[in-house]
Amino acid sequence: MNKFKNIAVYGGGSFGTSLASVVARNCNNVTLFLRNETILKEILYKKTNVQYLGDIKLPTNLQATTNLSVIKDFDLIIIAVPSYAFVDAIKLLKTYGISKDNTLLVATKGFAHNPTELLSDRLNTLLPDNPIGFLSGPNLAKELAKNLHTSASIASLDIDIANKIAHNLSSKTFTTNTTIDIVTLQVAGALKNIFAIKSGIDLAREQGANSRAMLIVAALKEITTLSKVLGGMQKNSDILLEAGVVGDLVLTCYSLGSRNTKFGYEFEISMDKKKFLREYKELVEGREALKLVLDLIKKYNLHMPIVSEVASLIHCGIYI
């Protein structure tokens, strides 16, 4: 199978940098696109990104730039920005000339807003002719950067595209599986952050290991509920057993290295919850996703008790 000649990663945060490291270990021509000039110089000359990844050394062949005018020349462009910035990022890349010749791999997890919809649906409007894939898995940024073993699912409506991306990214420490179920992979990637908030709350309440295990079971049911109404799991539910769904869900819910689990835990133990929510500065994707998932629950009249419970505490309850 053919290799991509060169690969771009757009997004210089913790996940973007660590994902670029994964790709650079398997491909020679990899460039990280970012905005911060200080971090750019650090990556180029010291091969670190201390702000996001501490003193972890990045691959020596990893290049970096702030010059978006050249991104159109890359065969594969990996998008690794927060969900709230996703649509603006795609619109920006369009102004720099990306075309149907560029394959996109979306590593962002969440929904597009105004209106609330899957990222794939928004991409169908913004870039209808581009080959598109989606990546999700149990991938904590610092562990990726350290080259510790993990796995990921890669989805595309064109299985040949998914397989080509997987072929380019896979290594002994980064294994992949492929699927055409782009809907379930996206739904799981967005909802797992909400479930992780619930996991953190339960941990603070000392609910025990049994309760957290049952949370995983209930979470998979709610992923199934939303996925099916959005067009996922039309033939089977095997995708639930893959790295990008149950693997990512378990990691996010069980690790305090997860920002969402940490947020849920700290929220629950805080004495002044209004103040906590008002002053919490770290990006929590689950908190952002809540507002959007509630729109979908209302639109399709869905029963999703975990999401509704977390929303009643965090988003639409007395703590707003």
Swiss-Prot record:
UniProtKB keywords = Cytoplasm, Lipid biosynthesis, Lipid metabolism, NAD, NADP, Nucleotide-binding, Oxidoreductase, Phospholipid biosynthesis, Phospholipid metabolism
Gene3D superfamilies with a match to the protein in the record? N-(1-d-carboxylethyl)-l-norvaline Dehydrogenase, domain 2 (1.10.1040.10), NAD(P)-binding Rossmann-like Domain (3.40.50.720)
To which pathway does this protein belong?
Membrane lipid metabolism; glycerophospholipid metabolism
Task: Give the enzyme's EC designation.
Answer: 1.1.1.94
Q: Which GO terms describe its cellular component?
A: cytosol
Q: What positions does the entry give for NADPH binding?
A: S14, F15, R35, K109, A141, R259, L283, E285
GO terms for biological process, alphabetical: carbohydrate metabolic process; glycerol-3-phosphate biosynthetic process; glycerol-3-phosphate catabolic process; glycerophospholipid metabolic process; phospholipid biosynthetic process
Query: Which residues are annotated as active site?
Result: K192 (proton acceptor)
Query: PROSITE patterns attached here?
Result: NAD_G3PDH
Name the catalysed reactions.
sn-glycerol 3-phosphate + NAD(+) = dihydroxyacetone phosphate + NADH + H(+); sn-glycerol 3-phosphate + NADP(+) = dihydroxyacetone phosphate + NADPH + H(+)
Gene Ontology molecular-function annotations: glycerol-3-phosphate dehydrogenase [NAD(P)+] activity; NAD binding
Can you say where in the cell this protein is located? Cytoplasm
Provide the residue positions that the database annotates as binding sn-glycerol 3-phosphate: K109, G137, K192, D248, S258, R259, N260
Q: What does this protein do?
A: Catalyzes the reduction of the glycolytic intermediate dihydroxyacetone phosphate (DHAP) to sn-glycerol 3-phosphate (G3P), the key precursor for phospholipid synthesis.
* Family stated for the protein in its record: Belongs to the NAD-dependent glycerol-3-phosphate dehydrogenase family.
Entry protein name: Glycerol-3-phosphate dehydrogenase [NAD(P)+]
Provenance organism: Rickettsia typhi (strain ATCC VR-144 / Wilmington)
